[in-house]
Swiss-Prot record:
Residues that, per the record, bind Fe cation 2: D83, D166, H227
Binding site for Fe cation 3: C428, C431, C461, C464
Residues the record lists as binding Fe cation 1: H79, E81, H147, D166
Organism: Salmonella arizonae (strain ATCC BAA-731 / CDC346-86 / RSK2980)
Domain (Rubredoxin-like) ranges: 423-474
Gene3D superfamilies from the UniProt entry: 2.20.28.10, 3.40.50.360, Ribonuclease Z/Hydroxyacylglutathione hydrolase-like (3.60.15.10)
Protein name (database record): Anaerobic nitric oxide reductase flavorubredoxin
Amino acid sequence: MSILVKNNIHWVGQRDWEVRDFHGTEYKTLRGSSYNSYLIREEKNVLIDTVDHKFSREFVQNLRSEIDLADIDYIIINHAEEDHAGALTELMAQIPDAPIYCTANAIDSINGHHHHPEWNFKVVKTGDTLDIGNGKQLIFVETPMLHWPDSMMTYMTGDAVLFSNDAFGQHYCDERLFNDEVDQTELFEQCQRYYANILTPFSRLVTPKITEILGFNLPVDMIATSHGVVWRDNPTQIVELYLKWAADYQEDRITIFYDTMSNNTRIMADAIAQGINEVDPNVAVKIFNVARSDKNEILTNVFRSKGVLVGTSTMNNVMMPKIAGLVEEMTGLRFRNKRASAFGSHGWSGGAVDRLSTRLQDAGFEMSLSLKAKWRPDLDALELCRQHGRDIARQWALAPLPETTQKTTPAEEITTCAAADLGPKMQCSVCQWIYDPALGEPLQDVAPGTPWSDVPDNFLCPECSLGKDVFDVLATEAK
């Protein structure tokens, strides 16, 4: 099946509704993807890119239903990655002499995947042209490291279509092809997710390359990407977004993510967020448990944020493995113009937070003071967490915040009041988790200072997920 793109240009690609992993398992394609290939029929017939290798046979069969394969005059490979050039072996078995136009770097990549150095490669550079008849030409623009060394774009004169390769695309599958036909919220979420997780390391190259392309003074009526939609309605809107995202992008947003062994670091995260909100209720704060969250969503939020707070329990004197992995990935993404702070709980040894602070600094973040708590945070420790959040809110504010008078209750008074009025601590008889009325359980909307008798009946133990009926009065407090 083909879809008319414009005049003599047809989409002959492949939708992939089921794909959920990309680049191994590093990118979660929660809304599927598409592999966009385009057939141009002028006096010369041109195929731009193929599809992912797993669809090779279907692609060639579908292409044969559109055109006699022997009538294809030129093949353009904008990018040698297997989701673009994966069907070349199947196709070239049918038309072995067809010329393949690509960059010099692409020849190395294509041969590395397909092992056919005898193919008829034609090397092109920025500014080279290819006459396709009817007064139209293809103009090639090299775009190295956006996002592979072999990458290029192809511009078609006359129809003013830019075949943009990975740039301006998104992993987004829909039966409809054009940007004005699909859900706009979904579309732009996937555009930003794609940029944040794939193109962020190359942001320093995005602006000069777009400037170079604009310098050709060529009209762009349509942008035909390699993944996702074709931009036909106001195509420059995505170009403007890329320029914005490439300029050390940040919103008035703070991302907190953590991993925890006994929920202690989670409690710290919640208290820090409360402190931030007390001082700056306008800043958006998002909290993620890395063990239960989509990694790419976390990284997209980091991309959007002015700062990030990263929490970890100490395990074997180092940070939790999922935190270490995510920080390593942030190092590779090379975020700029962002601040960071490490926090976490520990028992007899607290080496993780210091290691985490060093890793975040090595990743290019401007560091603020870290915060540690020993064992499960008590009232004093929770107040320190909230104060840390207040301090962070002021330090990271994009504009000066009004001064506020913080009313505090002495810790001794709180403790006395808690002991006198809140009743005993309760212990889960299954996993031994302890409910402290003075601390509550904020993640289940049980506020600090809530007696066990007032805890909702649908309360679940944070450790073993069993209900209130498995709790007993803590033995040390039983009378």
